[in-house]
Regions:
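Cross-family detector of peptidyl-prolyl cis-trans isomerase
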Residues: 3-209
Length: 209
């Protein structure tokens, strides 16, 4: 693999990414569990417990499965409109990209003081076919994911939780389906994929129309 813009090979950048994820986990005292343990405890995670999905490299902590909790339903095959609010945080310092560990890169959650950011959630159409999940953003407003990252493709890492959550329609910030994720570059945004860096997310999932 040829060297990237910063003079490192892709393999070296992947090693740096893995080191950054490991350091983030240690600094936040996360407990990492296997998929087997996750299934053995009925796809529930404890407060500071993250399950590692080996195939994707995504780490997930479920904060709330949805407004009806375990009595809700996972999404069935077909198309669904999903509304998400999120915060995207750098897990790795990258001088050439002008961000450091812990920097907020993009968000539309919480009191930001920017009405354009706060007013609209991310809207995307989720398609489930057998075990395949794909999604496309439906809007490209200023400061939206599609606008900032130049693609309507929803990061694959965002879709991993939807196999386990039971989202509904709610205006309650306490009952909305919500997760925390650590997403490696291959499951992240187009920019993360291009420059090989991981991100931490907190994301909510609400059903649209």
């Amino acid at each position: 693999m040829q060297s990237c813009d910063n003079g490192k090979t892709y393999a070296e950048m992947k090693e740096d990414e893995a080191d950054a994820i490991h350091a983030w986990i240690l600094s936040h005292n996360y407990q990492i569990i296997s998929e087997r343990d996750f299934y053995n405890q009925d796809t529930v995670t404890n407060e500071n417990q993250f399950v590692l999905f080996e195939e994707s490299g995504v780490y997930m902590n479920i904060m709330c499965k949805g407004p009806n909790g375990e009595n809700g339903e996972v999404l069935k095959e077909g198309s669904h409109e999903i509304l998400s609010r999120f915060v995207e945080v750098a897990v790795q310092s990258r001088d050439e990209l002008e961000f450091s560990v812990g920097d907020t890169l993009l968000w539309n959650m919480g009191n930001t003081g920017n009405s354009t950011l706060e007013l609209f959630p991310e809207e995307y159409k989720l398609t489930i076919s057998s075990s395949s999940y794909s999604a496309a953003f439906q809007t490209s407003r200023e400061y939206s994911m599609a606008s900032i990252y130049g693609t309507t493709s929803v990061p694959s890492g965002w879709l991993v939780p939807l196999k386990y959550l039971k989202p509904g329609r709610t205006t309650s910030s306490e009952k909305v389906a919500r997760v925390r994720l650590i997403v490696p570059h291959g499951q992240g945004t187009s920019k993360a994929s291009q420059y090989v860096y991981p991100c931490y997310y907190e994301i909510t999932y609400n059903l649209g129309k």
